[in-house]
Amino acid sequence: MKGKTMRIAVAVCLCFGTVSAQEQLRVRPAEVQQEDVVAALGALGVDVLRFDFSDFTRENYDVAVYLDEADSTGTERLYTVRAGGTRQQLTRMPEEVRRGFRKELHLPETTTEYVRGRSLTLIFSQKNDSTKLLTVHIPGMMRFSLPLELRDSGAGGEPRYFYSLRPFKLSAVEAGSEEIPLVFYSSGWYDPKAGVVRSCGVSEIDPALTDELVGLSPHYYVVGVIFEKKE
């Protein structure tokens, strides 16, 4: 009888030992990931999109960023901001200026040209309730900001500004002069039957602006880039 009792006690101890080992669980610090940064920026009302245009540095292309605004009355090009060429010819500079460029950019003495820019970043941040601030940054070429005036969604009562950001579909283009829309920033529309402001539709906009969402949005902006091949 005593032997049986001892075996049961040993078995119980082994079971508790197993449970105890399984309960050694921990939460550990971890490195902040890109999705965490994106989520934090979103919580602050900031959206960031980056585009790689390094294909347009194989040859020299003039780069310009444009901003269009559209509503029921039509479309207007508000701004076209030129950044210059994607490649810089050092041989066309005075020798003193050339040496300064080489020193600043850590270029070898034999360098005759260099790539000025390879990517474009668009930053949408909140200036106030009715104004968004668009910042365009092309490292090595230019940086500027433009205000985007928002419009009331028409829901009645206090003004409500409900806008959403969608990228355009991007496809390969032929070498030459190209105008490429990058981002569609659009107002929602008020649905009186449901009593809500909607902004339903595709996740990527067709460059031809044929999506139903485009027709339903009462006000939107298009941000794009123009490449013109230099002979």
Regions found by a protein language model. Give the residues of each.
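Bacterial Sec-dependent N-terminal signal peptides
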Residues: 1-26
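Short N-terminal segments immediately surrounding and downstream of signal-peptide cleavage
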Residues: 23-39
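Contiguous beta-strand segments within globular domains
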Residues: 43-51
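Short amphipathic, basic-aromatic surface patches that mediate peripheral association
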Residues: 53-55
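Structured domain cores in non-transmembrane regions
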Residues: 57-158
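Short, solvent-exposed mixed-charge patches
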Residues: 230-231
